[in-house]
Amino acid sequence: MTAPALSPTLELACELINRPSVTPLDEGCQQLMSQRLAACGFAIEPMHIEDVENFWAIRGNEGPVLCFAGHTDVVPTGPLQAWQNPPFSARIDEQGMLHGRGAADMKGSLAAMVVAVERFTADHPDHKGQIAFLITSDEEGPAHHGTKAVVERLRERGQRLDWCIVGEPSSTSLVGDVVKNGRRGSLGGTLTVRGQQGHVAYPHLAKNPIHLAAPALAELAAEHWDDGNAFFPPTSFQISNLNAGTGATNVIPGTLEAVFNFRFSTESTVEGLQQRTAAILDKHGLDWSIDWALSGLPFLTEPGDLLDGVAKAIRSVTGRETTPSTSGGTSDGRFIATLGTQVVELGPVNATIHQVDEHILASDLDVLTDIYYQTLVNLLAC
């Protein structure tokens, strides 16, 4: 019995999954996408930055720009023997599940974007505005030479970006049930508290940084940073790593190091969080220093052309009302939003992302393709 033919989206998704593009590698994924886009009239601009492959593609000459953004890199597989199916050999099982690293995050979305645009440009060759793609192989890694760097080049040349759909797996149970219309900011820090090393039997000759820091860390953890707002939950503070000691049981350590992170709403600022943290540490009389690292500022896309167009497309294709959300971690949307762009994240169900045996319902990618296509119709059809 002959296996049923795959849809164009599933064919492309399988081709992309079969390429072992563990971050920051691309393994030819972008070339495959670029060839397809060039065939329907896109101008392709590869951007090789350090060890990262990126490309910018655009079709049209004037009017508002709808950009599709995403990444071809995937996270490492973990132990291969733990996978039921080789991670870079796409397979659709008897239950209709598409297996492979990147099926959900986010090669499935990339395939849906390309096929949706191929259909739209064939049906509407003289569409309004412009369609663009911003694709990187540096999202799952440090993310220094990917979308962030490409956005800076676009900013320097004055490239407008009105609307952007990022293909992150936003859905929770059914495709389109949730879209991300913003993300919290992420501010990390490494706190060093200095004491005086000594013998545990002679504490009066030492200063134990663990004892000194504990009340301050407890106060930081209990602090009410803000109330959040209608779009964001309250800002959170979490300690992720705590290190002190030499490994010996009879030595008071000389220093303590605590790694922490703020996920912050638009009700707080970087400067405000830093100042309040410093005030608490100073109140406890600590000898301290912090190495701060800002991963991204919070951004929010309020109801408007893009969010309305996406919600209308989801309703038209699935009959469902979508729920906008700002929950979850950071994404490359934080870089694109700095251009003043309306940004929405819309992709497959995220239940197995970054896991062994990553998989999604294969038919969901055809639904996603239809949603992307209908969004193009809603925003750019003449």
From Swiss-Prot:
The family note in this entry says: Belongs to the peptidase M20A family. DapE subfamily.
What domain of life does the UniProt record list for this protein's source?
A: Bacteria
- Pathway, according to UniProt? Amino-acid biosynthesis; L-lysine biosynthesis via DAP pathway; LL-2,6-diaminopimelate from (S)-tetrahydrodipicolinate (succinylase route): step 3/3
Q: Where is the active site?
A: 73, 139 (proton acceptor)
Q: Does the keyword Nucleotide-binding apply?
A: no
Q: Which reaction does it catalyse?
A: N-succinyl-(2S,6S)-2,6-diaminopimelate + H2O = (2S,6S)-2,6-diaminopimelate + succinate
Known role: Catalyzes the hydrolysis of N-succinyl-L,L-diaminopimelic acid (SDAP), forming succinate and LL-2,6-diaminopimelate (DAP), an intermediate involved in the bacterial biosynthesis of lysine and meso-diaminopimelic acid, an essential component of bacterial cell walls.
Which residues are involved in binding Zn(2+) 2? 105, 140, 354
Give the keywords, sorted: Amino-acid biosynthesis, Cobalt, Diaminopimelate biosynthesis, Hydrolase, Lysine biosynthesis, Metal-binding, Zinc
Chain residues that bind Zn(2+) 1? 71, 105, 168
UniProt EC number? 3.5.1.18
Q: Which PANTHER family match?
A: ACETYLORNITHINE DEACETYLASE (PTHR43808), N-ACETYL-L-CITRULLINE DEACETYLASE (PTHR43808:SF31)
Query: Which residue ranges does UniProt annotate as crossing the membrane?
Result: none
The free-text cofactor remark is: Binds 2 Zn(2+) or Co(2+) ions per subunit.
Stored InterPro entries = ArgE/DapE_CS, Bact_exopeptidase_dim_dom, DapE_proteobac, Peptidase_M20, Peptidase_M20_dimer, Peptidase_M20A
What name does UniProt use for this protein?
Succinyl-diaminopimelate desuccinylase
Q: Indicate the quaternary assembly.
A: Homodimer.
**HAMAP family, alphabetized:** DapE (MF_01690)
Q: Which GO terms describe its molecular function?
A: acetylornithine deacetylase activity; cobalt ion binding; succinyl-diaminopimelate desuccinylase activity; zinc ion binding
Name one process (GO BP) from the record. Answer: L-arginine biosynthetic process
Co-factor requirement: Zn(2+); Co(2+)
